[in-house]
């Protein structure tokens, strides 16, 4: 199906929810400990999250420019194809479909199951793997049936993920006790630890480019996509920094 025959049904809030929702996931849970360990000090850990988000800003600005110039489904495949690199475009599409997205989806599903298993031990082992498969199939079927329904689902699921974080942040600010800010730095922790901390944030800031893969589904993509991409990185940056 060509992009001209697509019915553009999604707006800014769907784009923002998809960008934020695909970014804020298992990354913050998996990476937070790695960032703290690599940084060695709370101040360096917080700074690492800030720098990691700042580094992501130029990336999303480039994506915003490309998505505005070529508002078609396909993301990198379209951009490389338009640049005249058709073999590289094919390799990008092939690698994304077979090598990049499936492991990412599997990791996120297994992360959900792992956290559920801490409350419900039944989901340890084969039962957990089956639950992970079921989660993937259910979410896939929702998006397959309707683009608009998929967008609405993404708004809801993103809100469900973000609200608990906001509650933790608000409660932390309300009951802040500066006596708890005393800490013992990890031996050998120096400013050079910042590099390791920033590197550990990389996984947590990936995902915003997901909306570029479906640029042909958005109404007025020239305005919606840049606003959604830039807003999403700022929201995620603020969220991660406050959680750190």
Identify the residue ranges that each predicted region occupies.
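Membrane-interface "cap" regions at the ends of multi-pass membrane proteins
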Residues: 1-33, 37-43, 56-64, 72-73, ...
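Helix-loop-helix junctions that connect adjacent transmembrane segments
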Residues: 2-7, 42, 46, 123-127, ...
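Select transmembrane alpha-helical segments in multipass membrane proteins
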Residues: 9-19, 45, 85-98, 131-135, ...
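Lipid-exposed faces of alpha-helical membrane segments in multi-pass integral membrane proteins
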Residues: 20, 24, 47, 51-55, ...
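Short helix-kink/termination motifs in transmembrane helices of multi-pass secondary transporters
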Residues: 20-31, 102-106, 202, 206-209, ...
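Alpha-helical transmembrane segments of polytopic integral membrane proteins
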Residues: 29, 60-63, 109, 113, ...
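Hydrophobic transmembrane alpha-helices that form the core helical bundles
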Residues: 34-37, 57-136, 140-144, 149
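Interfacial loop-to-transmembrane-helix boundary motif in multi-pass membrane proteins
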Residues: 148-156
């Amino acid at each position: 199906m060509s992009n001209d025959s697509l019915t553009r049904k999604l707006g800014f809030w769907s784009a923002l929810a998809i960008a934020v929702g695909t970014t804020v996931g298992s990354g913050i849970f998996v990476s937070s400990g790695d960032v703290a360990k690599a940084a060695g000090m709370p101040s360096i850990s917080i700074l690492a999250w800030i720098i990691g988000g700042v580094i992501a800003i130029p990336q999303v600005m480039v994506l915003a420019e490309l998505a505005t110039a070529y508002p078609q489904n396909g993301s990198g495949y379209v951009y490389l194809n338009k640049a005249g690199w058709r073999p590289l475009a094919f390799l990008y599409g092939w690698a994304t479909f077979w090598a990049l997205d499936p492991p990412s989806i599997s990791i996120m599903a297994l992360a959900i199951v792992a956290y559920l298993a801490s409350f419900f031990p039944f989901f340890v082992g084969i039962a957990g793997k089956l639950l992970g498969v079921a989660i993937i199939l259910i979410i896939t079927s929702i998006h397959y049936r309707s683009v608009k329904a998929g967008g609405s689902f993404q708004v809801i699921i993103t809100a469900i993920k973000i609200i608990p974080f906001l509650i933790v942040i608000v409660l932390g600010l309300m009951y802040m006790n500066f006596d708890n800010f005393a800490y013992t730095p990890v031996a050998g922790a120096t400013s050079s630890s910042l590099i390791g901390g920033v590197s550990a944030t990389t996984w947590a800031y990936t995902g915003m480019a997901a909306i570029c893969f479906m640029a042909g589904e958005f109404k007025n993509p020239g305005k919606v996509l840049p606003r959604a991409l830039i807003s999403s990185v700022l929201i995620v940056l603020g969220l991660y920094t406050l959680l750190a």
